[in-house]
From Swiss-Prot:
Name assigned to this protein: Elongation factor G
Protein family membership: Belongs to the TRAFAC class translation factor GTPase superfamily. Classic translation factor GTPase family. EF-G/EF-2 subfamily.
Listed transmembrane segments: none
Broad class of where this protein is predominantly found: cytoplasm
Alphabetized Pfam families for the sequence: EFG_C, EFG_III, EFG_IV, GTP_EFTU, GTP_EFTU_D2
Gene this protein is translated from: fusA
Keywords: Cytoplasm, Elongation factor, GTP-binding, Nucleotide-binding, Protein biosynthesis
Length: 704
């Protein structure tokens, strides 16, 4: 099957926002208007197409990035009348699922940032915005829920400027707000758009309402000034008072959006069907095609030299696997974005990260959780492959004769863990395999066995994250499990620099064991993890034993010296040592490395670290004092407060250990009228009295 649309007519977009900005409803409307849906699903009825997991339908939130494809022909704009393909990734808004947002942004060419006209910029909007900045993703902003009481378009625009540090430029302004929201003024064409009251999908063009003429003129001048600043020809025309055509405005706006110097802002009410078609026109007009993105960079795994791939079908095949999912019917699905070349179903690809070759059985284009078979996929496409067993998130798939490794994806470490125990013997047999499958799908989910207790521990990004995964165990894998209390993922590090000798000697008849190392330990800056440096001079330890010393140190770091938690941010230099011609072995040096590290760590002022969370609470004013008092009582450090959308917000840094069960406390304290968001910020030293309690607990556990 040949390519359906030219590459410059493809848009790979994400829809990003915080919870309750109307993201899933907006996606539903897009699918309806582009002809992919014949009946619209409502989130609050649990019938939305893109939310296809049971847990999503129940909770009314989006957990996994469902991918879908559709076609749109703009009615207005520089591309009017030309058919385009839009691949959409619907991303979750809950902070526990930030990894889903992160990995979808990595493979997108543009995004629609949704904001609630009442709430404006919520905490999660800031998180997602930072992630989009990190990948340089061009955005348009869509201020949704204009029909809600308290809707304020201009306040939302102001919040985008002030809280996100962006340069929002409205290209529409609303006609009416709240129940009176009837449509908008198109500032480029200077026309009014009024929607049918019953059916929002029909509208008529009218002259700008008399009472809005001055305001529309002011905002058009604002838009013209913003685009003129970025183009000398336009600036000259503007200063001379010459007419500027619609095409000229759109062309400069497009360039400014692509380099993220302007964020065009639109408005609407997806629920009431108002504004979605014009937002789709803006997606085509202002967001990037794979051609605009230009070359993708990587390196040749054989020579390590940098190489590039042009976004063309004629180039060698290169794609990034950005998501692994388990499908009840076809098994493991690997979602990938094609950057160059063509992939035919049934052909072989090289995983250039592992060096393994695998056959792609079938290629599917996903529509939420329904699928369509494709014979081939082309540069710029987003699709799913069946049959790839060894591929992990972030791996590069490419032509085996022209290997390339694309930039990998980096994911945050989990901060919370719980013990899970199978309820029956049958569950026990399935538990390990089921957890392994879930860990394969989600890079921020870890599974390990506690060596002391034999318990299975699962770790993730938050309570909701783990709750959903345990729920999936039950529903998808039919595994019943008992779940323990959430535990904090504490860490240990050192504050001092020391040198220490580690010696392992066994020489009592027969072949002995001998290994002696001298190590220097020093602290690394936060987040650097672990660094090993070989400073051996004059062959004091033969080269072949040095990796064993490193392995022994890393083994010892898993079980810290303060309270047995993993150690981090430590630099270890191997500076001297001794070996024995006959008795030395890899094992002897591994044990010596471990002994040396433990001894050095005890002398290097070791400390316990705990995860600190960035918390934001939004509450009615009458509960503000209670909320702040409660946060302070949780060892929280208040960082700021203010007013937003008629409510008060409080920002604080609070240890994760103090936040368990917070949602229940907050609900009862505010009669359910407050809400909060929380995300991992950093690790910080635990106060001495709490560290001592934790040590006693661990020691008590060990001696039982």
């Amino acid at each position: 099957m040949a390519r359906q649309v030219a590459l410059d007519k493809v848009r790979n977009i994400g829809i990003m926002a915080h919870i309750d900005a109307g993201k899933t409803t907006t996606t539903e409307r897009i699918l309806y208007y582009t002809g992919r849906l014949h009946k619209m699903g409502e989130v609050h009825e649990g019938g939305a197409t893109m939310d296809w997991m049971e847990q999503e339908k129940e909770r009314g939130i989006t957990i996994t990035s469902a991918a879908t494809t559709c076609f749109w022909t703009p009615k207005f704009g520089n591309y009017s009348g030309v058919n385009h393909r839009i691949n959409i990734i619907d991303t979750p808004g809950h902070v526990d699922f930030t990894v889903e947002v992160e990995r979808s942004l990595r493979v997108l060419d543009g995004a629609v940032a949704l904001f609630c006209a009442v709430g404006g910029v919520e905490p999660q909007s800031e998180t997602v915005w930072r992630q989009a900045n990190k990948y340089g993703v061009p955005r348009i902003a869509y201020v949704n829920k204009m029909d809600r009481t308290g809707a304020d378009f201009f306040n939302a625009v102001k919040a985008i400027r002030e809280r996100l540090g962006a340069n929002p430029v409205p290209i529409q302004i609303p006609i009416g707000e709240g129940e009176m929201f009837a449509g908008f003024v198109d500032l480029i064409r200077m026309k009014g758009i009024i929607y049918d009251k019953e059916d929002g999908s029909t509208y008529e063009e009218v002259a700008i309402p008399h009472d809005l003429e001055n305001e529309a003129r002011t905002w058009r001048i604002n838009m013209l000034e913003a685009v003129s600043e970025l183009d000398e020809t336009l600036l000259e025309k503007y200063l001379n008072g010459d007419d500027i055509t619609e095409e000229e405005i759109r062309s400069v706006l497009r360039q400014a959006t692509l380099n993220v110097s302007i964020i065009p802002v639109l408005c609407g009410s997806s629920f009431k069907n108002k504004g979605v078609q014009f937002m789709l026109d803006a997606v085509i007009d202002y967001l990037a095609s794979p051609v605009d993105d230009g070359v993708v960079e990587g390196h040749d795994p054989r020579t390590e030299e940098e190489i590039v791939r042009q976004p063309k079908d004629e180039e060698p095949f290169a794609a990034l696997a950005f998501k692994i999912a388990t499908d009840p019917f076809v098994g493991k699905l690997t979602f990938f974005r094609v950057y160059s070349g063509v992939l035919n179903a049934g052909s072989y690809v090289l995983n250039s990260v592992t060096g393994k070759k695998e056959r792609v059985g079938r290629v599917l284009q996903m529509h939420s959780n329904k699928r369509e078979e494709r014979d081939a996929v082309y540069a710029g496409d987003i699709a799913a492959a069946v049959g790839l067993k060894e591929v992990r998130t972030g791996d590069t798939l490419c032509d085996e004769n022209k290997p390339i490794v694309l930039e990998k994806m980096v994911f945050p470490e989990p901060v919370i863990e719980i013990a899970v125990e199978p309820k029956t013997k049958a569950d026990n047999d399935k538990l390990g395999m089921s957890l392994a499958k879930l860990a394969e799908e989600d890079p921020t989910f870890r599974v390990k066995t506690d060596e002391e207790t034999g318990q299975t521990l699962i770790a993730g990004m938050g309570e909701l994250h783990l709750e959903v995964l345990v729920d999936r165990l039950k529903r998808e894998f039919k595994v019943e499990a008992n779940v323990g209390q959430p535990q904090v993922a504490y860490r240990e590090t050192i504050r001092g620099t020391v040198e220490h000798e580690g010696k392992f000697v066994r020489q009592s008849g027969g072949k002995g064991q001998f290994g002696l190392v001298v190590l220097r330990l020093e602290p690394l800056e936060e987040g650097k993890g672990y660094e090993f440096v070989d400073e051996i001079k004059g062959g004091a330890i033969p080269k072949e034993y040095i990796p064993s010393v490193n392995a022994g140190i890393q083994q010892a770091m898993k079980d810290g010296v303060v309270a047995g938690f993993p150690m981090q941010d430590v630099k270890v230099a191997l500076i001297d040592g001794k070996y024995h011609e006959v008795d030395s072995s890899e094992m002897a040096f591994k044990i010596a490395g471990s002994i040396g590290f433990k001894g050095a760590a005890k002398k290097a002022n070791p400390v316990l670290l705990e995860p600190i969370m960035k918390v934001e609470v939004i509450t009615p004013e009458e509960y503000l004092g209670d909320v702040m008092g409660d946060l302070s009582g949780r060892r929280g450090h208040i960082e700021g407060m203010g007013e937003r959308a008629g409510a008060q917000f409080v920002k604080a840094k609070v240890p994760l250990s103090e936040m368990f069960g917070y949602s229940t406390t907050l609900r009862s304290m505010t009669q359910g009228r407050a809400n909060y968001s929380m995300e991992f910020e950093t690790y910080r030293e635990v106060p001495r009295n709490i560290a001592e309690t934790l040590q006693e607990k661990r020691v008590g556990k060990d001696s039982e």
